[in-house]
């Protein structure tokens, strides 16, 4: 356990950030999975789910949770699945 006050505060803020980041990543993965499930089921709201998944990927990238190449790769694969 840290003893210095600033170190204690830093632990607290890093735990909050870790929870926030995990939540954001989970939201991105969930959006992608929802799109994939809807695609397999042949749902008619595929456009909205596709846009939501792309938006979630972009949001995760802009917040620094995933790197640019991963964002581009995920969006490319999602677009390929959407086109099929």
UniProtKB/Swiss-Prot annotation:
GO terms for biological process: translation. GO terms for cellular component: cytosol; small ribosomal subunit. It holds the Pfam family Ribosomal_S20p. It comes from the Bacteria. The keyword Ribosomal protein applies. InterPro entries: Ribosomal_bS20, Ribosomal_bS20_sf. GO terms for molecular function: small ribosomal subunit rRNA binding; structural constituent of ribosome. SUPFAM superfamilies: Ribosomal protein S20. Keywords: Ribonucleoprotein, Ribosomal protein, RNA-binding, rRNA-binding. Gene3D superfamilies: Ribosomal protein S20. HAMAP family: Ribosomal_bS20 (MF_00500). Belongs to the bacterial ribosomal protein bS20 family. Binds directly to 16S ribosomal RNA. This is Small ribosomal subunit protein bS20. The gene is rpsT.
């Amino acid at each position: 356990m840290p003893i210095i006050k600033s170190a204690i505060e830093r632990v607290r803020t890093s735990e909050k950030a870790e929870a926030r980041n995990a939540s954001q990543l989970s939201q991105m993965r969930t959006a992608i999975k929802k799109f994939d499930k809807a695609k397999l089921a042949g749902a008619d709201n595929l456009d909205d789910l596709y846009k939501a998944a792309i938006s979630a990927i972009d949001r995760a990238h802009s917040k620094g949770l995933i790197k640019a190449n991963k964002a581009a790769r995920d969006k490319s694969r999602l677009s390929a699945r959407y086109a099929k």
